[in-house]
Amino acid sequence: MTANEFILALDQGTTSSRAIVFDRAGTVRGMGQREFRQHYPRPGWVEHDAGEIWQSQLEVAREALRNAGASAADLAALGITNQRETTLIWERATGRPLARAIVWQDRRTAAMCEKLLHDGHGRMLQERTGLVVDAYFSGTKLAWLLDHVPGARKMAERGELAFGTVDTWLVWQLTGGAVHSTDPSNASRTMLFDLHAQDWSDDILALLNIPRGILPRIAPSSARIGETLPEWLGGSIPIAGVAGDQQAATFGQACFTPGMAKNTYGTGCFMLMNVGDAPVASRHNLLSTVGWSLPAGNATHATYMVEGGVFMAGAAVQWLRDGLGIIQRSADIEALAASVADTDDVFMVPAFAGLGAPHWDPYARGTLVGMTRGTTRAHIARATLESIALQSAELLSCMNADSGIPLSELRVDGGAARNDLLMQMQADLLGVPVVRPRVPESTALGAAGLAGLAVGFWSSLDEFGAQWQAERTFEPAWPADVREARMQRWRQAVELSKGWSRPAAGHA
């Protein structure tokens, strides 16, 4: 085995830590995965143990190397991708976390966000950061930690405290505290980062009463930022790529030109579209975010995305399984849905937790409409599957409108992307090809790609992109009038779901 033959990607997710060894062809050569504990100390609170994140990530990195038959000497570089927005603080001198990490799903700062909106800061925050004001993002989580963890604010003011998202925490640990760094894709999810200035916003830091000194420096997503301590993985490895998970997946899917987009089908769906070298202000309350930044001579060049999310995708299928008992396993839905030719005009709006973009109605609730005595469990299964494709098509239409760039094709990944019927539905509703890649590990591959570019493992974006291959392409079969009629019927069903749980006398 020759030196510098592989790239190691660390993929630190919400429920598990993973590590994957890739070769130059983008093929998986070894993998490790460990789940870790979720903490729910109060309703709406979600926490992770920072030490467990680090230990689980270190264990799976060693496991991936063993499974690949590789050592640190065989690695050209290491890349990191991570669950975004999750917020940590630790003592600079010791690396000791002062509290558990507040996870992106955690809602404890919802009231703080409502106050920011009530006080008239919403427009400024959205214009600067590209984000809607929400407890989802790191800024209010960090403010909460400084105000509620004993001694945290005084330590921050004395310069003794460090803040980071999960990527920053892992880099700190891997380098023994030598590097306190993040990248623009993660920084742009904090609600503290000015998209236009490509730096932390002093105005927002003042608004949230956060000392700038606790923030990490911002390095390009593809750049050699430090080296691992030899004791961790048996040798010193350059850390050369960092990106948030959804942006890394977009990079791994080689969506390098404006108009290219990917959709990750999981519990929910995450859609990102490349909009080029300037941020796009959404008219549909989609998020504007940095995809990645690459060195360009003495400067860096950022690529921007618009992002939309579907709350309930695979989760709606799980409800059919666990709530209704219509299927025994989630995988059973494809055969059941395929046993009927269509939904017989049945629509399922899976607004179990409200509706996200472009509707943003927290009072909407799950709705099944169009049923007759002839409706069967197969029709309901097909309508549920189709709801995933309908929601995604609606969001991608908004992305087209915001960006002014027509979608050329949709690249897909995630567990539900293996469902051939769903992928065909998606192509029919979009009117463009839906393409599933040969390598399904898009997120980790993106981190590997960013790291590999920084050290010359791949010489260019074109060379890295050339290893991307389609496993299957789903071509649209519906004419435009059929597609539009289906979308119009869907919009009718969505309107019926809105406002249902509003705590007022009447319903919307």
From Swiss-Prot:
Keywords, A to Z? Answer: ATP-binding, Glycerol metabolism, Kinase, Nucleotide-binding, Transferase
A biological process term (GO) from this entry: glycerol metabolic process
Stated EC number for the protein is 2.7.1.30
- Which terms does the record give in the GO molecular function aspect? ATP binding; glycerol kinase activity
Record pathway: Polyol metabolism; glycerol degradation via glycerol kinase pathway; sn-glycerol 3-phosphate from glycerol: step 1/1
Binding positions for ATP per the UniProt entry? 14-16, 267, 314, 318, 415
Q: Which reaction does it catalyse?
A: glycerol + ATP = sn-glycerol 3-phosphate + ADP + H(+)
Could you tell me what this protein does? Key enzyme in the regulation of glycerol uptake and metabolism. Catalyzes the phosphorylation of glycerol to yield sn-glycerol 3-phosphate.
| Family classification | Belongs to the FGGY kinase family.
**Which protein are we looking at?**
Glycerol kinase
Give the organism, scientific name: Bordetella parapertussis (strain 12822 / ATCC BAA-587 / NCTC 13253)
Q: What is the lineage of its organism?
A: Bacteria, Pseudomonadati, Pseudomonadota, Betaproteobacteria, Burkholderiales
